[in-house]
Amino acid sequence: MEEVCEGKEFSFPRQEEDVLSFWTEIDAFKTQLKRTENLPEYIFYDGPPFATGLPHYGHILAGTIKDIVTRYQTMTGHHVTRRFGWDCHGLPVENEIDRKLNIKRRDEVIKMGIDKYNEECRSIVTRYVAEWEKVITRCGRWIDFKNDYKTMDLPFMESVWWVFSQLWEKNLVYRGFKVMPYSTGCKTPLSNFEAGQNYKEVPDPEIMVTFPVIGDQDNAAFVAWTTTPWTLPSNLALCVNAKFVYVKVRNKNTGKVYIVAESRLSALPTDKPKAKLSNGPAGDTKKANPKAKGAKPESAADSYEVLEKFNGASLVGKKYEPLFDYFSDFSSEAFRVVADDYVTDDSGTGIVHCAPAFGEDDYRVCLLNKIIKKGENLVVAVDDDGLFTERITHFSGRYVKDADKDIIEAVKAKGRLVKTGSFTHSYPFCWRSDTPLIYRAVPSWFVRVEQLKEKLLKSNEQTEWVPGYVKDKRFHNWLENARDWAISRSRFWGTPLPIWISDDGEEVVIMDSVEKLEKLSGVKVFDLHRHHIDHITIPSSRGDEFGVLRRVEDVFDCWFESGSMPYAYIHYPFENKELFEKNFPGDFVAEGLDQTRGWFYTLMVLSTALFEKPAFKNLICNGLVLAEDGKKMAKKLRNYPPPLEVIDEYGADAVRLYLINSPVVRAEPLRFKKEGVLGVVKDVFLPWYNAYRFLVQNAKRLETEGGVPFVPTDLATIQSANILDQWIHSATQSLVRFVREEMDAYRLYTVVPRLLKFLDNLTNIYVRFNRKRLKGRTGEDDCHTALSTLFNVLLTSCKVMAPFTPFFTETLYQNLRKACKGSEESVHYCSIPPREGMEGERIELSVTRMMKIIDLARNIRERNKLPLKTPLKEMIVVHPDADFLNDITGVLREYVLEELNVRSLVPCNDTLKYASLKAEPDFSVLGKRLGKSMGLVAKEVKEMSQKDILAFEEAGEVTIANHLLKETDIKIVRVFKRPDDLKENEIDSAGDGDVLVILDLRADDSLVEAGFAREIVNRIQKLRKKSGLEPTDFVEVYFQSLDEDESVSKQVLVSQEQNIKDSIGSTLLLSSLMPSHAVIIADETFTPKETSDESVKKVPKLSYKISLARPALKFNEEAVLALYSGDVKSATGLQTYLLSRDHSNLKSEFQAGDGKITVSCIENVPVATVVLGEHLHLSVGDDLLSKRNA
């Protein structure tokens, strides 16, 4: 393995760029696909985005989820084809061209020419493809852009034709009028899910108008309420509820007689009318989600006299005088009262005015009552631009919303205005043009979705969603209330409907392929867009006298195209028939929550209609990524950092991990914070990198000391008696099992936290607690075992983490693989490791318990301002379970003592010796179960005696107030009892309700000395770091007392010599032993500071100097002189020569010569054999040890 730099010098973004270059060099993605082509297929459908805008964090999130799953499936033995796709048709593209060419009206497109318009559309479809590829590739996602699919390509469009033809054959398609949300800005109807994407709070007028009853003896008039005055010119009926009671009332002041629902009499104006009205009309469907903010009307009891009461059913059939005469030709069928249950009495007047061309319920009710006929005499008096047609003579050419005020004035002039006002409510706007939507009847082609409802619900049950509640609630409810789907659009740039109709409408031919069109028309077809096929006619099969069939003008809703993607992207059924039929439904899809009403829905509808099965088996639904302020991310608001800017600063892996380790993978919203990405770097990647670097450093040290390359022992054959080796091996197996189980269930939200917890345990438990072993302080064999364990765990974690953080794992893997024979060229060619060996649940539990004890003890230290360098005398662990105490006081005892800097650990299973017990009922568990009994049970639980609680802990259950309570129902809290002979500042405790940890805070002389020794060690380590030394760099450390009385420091150094040596890896030398030729690397002087910290006050106030020096040769002067029979000049020449040599080379020569070297290169000095240990030592420390041993 190669040396690696310090974490602070390591650039995550730069190493990712290097990895990208490496992947390009080895053609990694293509190679992976080639290597897996004979493995079972895993079918992934990638929803096509529009390329008319740049990718944002929502795209990156969904792309990351897709990349993780497909990488994982590849690494678990599948061939995963990943083709990117583009949604090329529809409003987004046309809007861009309309803005570019300043096109406002449909007829401007016709005048320009559909051919020119469509080619303009085609020219911008792939405008941002390069940018998309750049961002997606930089994010680490592997997907095929070269073999992408486009919804505008002929093979794709041909398959869409085939899908439609199958629906036609199943009698699932019909033509009719449907009142739909309509965008006057884009001149097209919108689907219901499109209409719900852009609501705004806006003011609108609201009025009450009269419709005089023909032939009524009291000259009564029906009163209707509406928020859409512009629909009044198209009124054809009034609707009541047959079950309601209606009243005929006379205004006591004006004498006017009105008919309204009895329960809505209060809505009529009083003598002092209010400016604001009620919250909304009774069942008025021409408004959109009204939420009026009007004042509550006064009582009308004093202003009106009730003349008559009658049931709504009795009003049915009564004729009334229309407001306007624009529809006088409908008089025989229209201008009468009908009844329907959609009329409510929670607002309005209980009477709804019906304009069937502009209200969904209006249309249904008028059709049901034969005021209009299906597909025939419906007159839509508003054109595609939202302007009144010539039929509405007084307002012809006016935009409907702009005409509201004048229409109100016209009603007032006719004496028909009862009341007027305004209110603010939530109203839908076009998600593309940002213009207010209207509801308008449009001729359209429909898929009979309502007819498929039961099959859709059945298909939904065959799928697995993450999170599940989105499927069971949101999507299920949407399917349950599904309406027929208008699949046609009166637009230009899209896949044309393959419907050819004769002039008399009697003959209809559906094209299911290009071949059929060419055969019937005799025209060669190379493109299916409108300007290439609109002119194509086919002869009538009835004979020449019936003329020809022409294509209808409409194109498909682009959602129909994307819903056809599973078939069209592989040109089914014209190609890949076996591939599709063998692997349908697909295995996996993933998009945002908004697609429950979009792509997920259209996929489900079409696959159920075609095959009576879902299009996919598994689905991950992510939430919305919002700006930090909680608002939707928007370029114009500049409320989010550009994705590439964040990636260039912190790396794509950090962005990926930040996104997928958040609520957004549970379909909840995420407020994106750049600081959160930085947090991932600091909390995950830097510790992970440092653990890896620590391995490399110590493996290189072992190589240097042993003279042979480091070859790790295989994980399966490591035989280690070390408890932490066994633990991390077991934890790794548990991790592999958990990741496989949860990833197979697509639960990323459980996998990622577990992965990060494992990395945290690896760095903060295994590496931290094993530093001495890993540094070789416990012997070469034990060091090799520890390093092999760390190596194998890091290698396994690289493979398991590879789908999540593809860059960093590749970087680590490329260096780690240098120590492995026969390793794969890339980590992404590897398999997710299988479980190797048994998991040690007992060992994992033991270490978990150890960490619980350590965390509680750290809390006590922090609370008492006692840093870890301050040694403590004793820790007591109180727990009733002997196994728990054995875990802590057995093989893990030394780790606990060393980590907490405590001298002794005392187990105690007598829970009442140091604590009193309290029982607390778990209300969250018991509340629902016990209901009204909860109060009594809670009272008795809290009153349980110490004896009762101990008995409950032993038995695991207790009966209270005739209810059997288990361990999970009651929380036992241990409250610390301080011994009477100790003061409050001499002892403290911490507990978690299960275990109690007690620390003796008193100091004694031995502890003070140990504390001073720990301080010295800490100073040395900081000086090493400050000097830029690597952990593998060997230096000698010298101590010099600066106090007049050096006896105190010497006493400490003697008593703590072994502890210091264990910590720094060498003997701490007195400065008096430093040779004159020693090379000092760094030194620093330390003097005690005044402090109020009681723990520090007890440490002796000593001044001293620490020096770090390169290892210096220590000569035995007498033995060197004897080599030359007392010739001082020759002896001095030898010493000078040896001091000039590189220390490490000299050491190697002695090792090679079995402790001897022959020196023959000194001019005028005889040849001499120098013996290590006899004539010199390679360091002062070696010399000192030799003298002591002698």
Curated annotation (Swiss-Prot):
Locations listed in the record: Cytoplasm, Cytosol
Region (Disordered): 271-299
Chain sites annotated for binding ATP: K635
Annotated disulfide bonds: none
Stretches assigned to coiled coil: none
Motif segment ('HIGH' region): 49-59
UniProtKB keywords: Aminoacyl-tRNA synthetase, ATP-binding, Cytoplasm, Ligase, Nucleotide-binding, Protein biosynthesis
Motif 'KMSKS' region, residue numbers: 632-636
EC number: 6.1.1.5
GO cellular component annotations of the record: cytosol
MF-aspect GO terms: aminoacyl-tRNA deacylase activity; ATP binding; isoleucine-tRNA ligase activity; tRNA binding
PROSITE patterns according to UniProt: AA_TRNA_LIGASE_I
EC class of the enzyme, as a word: ligase
Presence of the UniProt keyword Transferase in the record: no
A GO biological process held by the record: reproductive structure development
Reaction equations catalysed: tRNA(Ile) + L-isoleucine + ATP = L-isoleucyl-tRNA(Ile) + AMP + diphosphate
Similarity-based family: Belongs to the class-I aminoacyl-tRNA synthetase family.
Protein name per Swiss-Prot or TrEMBL: Isoleucine--tRNA ligase, cytoplasmic
Organism listed in the record: Arabidopsis thaliana (Mouse-ear cress)
